[in-house]
């Protein structure tokens, strides 16, 4: 049987350290999601307004965030702001800022798409029934939009969790960084440990994201 180096995880507190690193990744994701969801909803609603200047500004922001790789944004926020403005940002704070910028852009586009997908005749019918604009949104538009958005926003959460693997590049000790440290510390005693440890990291990410993906799929089928 091939030596996968899994015994390294049983030494000392290596497995506990890996789980702690996963906790850091999940914490960054959770904070970023909690901030970016309401901001994304607000910007998504604003993107449906007919003000050309506002739409242009928001579109430029959306395209900039989409085109720019997350790793470049991490370097720009973490290293660039430190040099340019003298800010003392921790790696985790810089990561949250970047993921909030990214998550807000993605969520705003989802909200915009969900709102413009509502047929115009529903607005017209509600107006014909004597409903105010606020009543139209509260009783007709928002319930439909929420049903469209929840599965998509849950998928955004899984994408954010997986993308946190990039934050090791700015020194955040998350699960992948811990895995590298364990491999380096045991390179001589267990030269084959890399495969087993990275396999464990894969399983941890899978266990973190799989239930969320199942929930998104279930809701999408239920509300289709």
Segments from the language model and where they lie:
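Transmembrane alpha-helices and adjacent helix-loop boundaries
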Residues: 1-224
């Amino acid at each position: 049987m091939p030596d996968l180096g899994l015994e390294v995880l049983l030494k000392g507190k290596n497995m506990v350290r890996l789980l702690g690193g996963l906790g850091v990744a999940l914490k960054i994701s959770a904070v970023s999601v909690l901030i970016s969801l309401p901001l994304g909803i607000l910007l998504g609603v604003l993107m449906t307004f007919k003000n050309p200047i506002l739409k242009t500004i928001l579109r430029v922001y959306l395209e900039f965030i989409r085109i720019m790789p997350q790793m470049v944004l991490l370097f720009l926020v973490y290293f660039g702001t430190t040099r340019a403005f003298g800010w003392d940002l921790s790696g985790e704070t810089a990561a949250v800022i970047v993921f909030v910028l990214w998550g807000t852009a993605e969520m705003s586009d989802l909200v915009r798409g969900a709102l413009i997908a509502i047929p115009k005749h529903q607005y017209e019918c509600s107006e014909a029934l004597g409903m105010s604009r606020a009543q139209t949104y509260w009783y007709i538009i928002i319930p439909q939009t929420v049903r469209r958005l929840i599965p998509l926003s849950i998928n955004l959460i899984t994408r954010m969790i997986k993308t946190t693997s990039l934050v090791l590049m700015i020194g955040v000790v998350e699960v992948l960084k811990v895995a590298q440290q364990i491999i380096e510390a045991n390179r001589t005693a267990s030269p084959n440990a890399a495969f087993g440890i990275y396999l464990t990291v894969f399983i941890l990410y899978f266990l973190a994201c799989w239930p969320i993906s199942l929930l998104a799929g279930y809701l999408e089928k239920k509300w289709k």
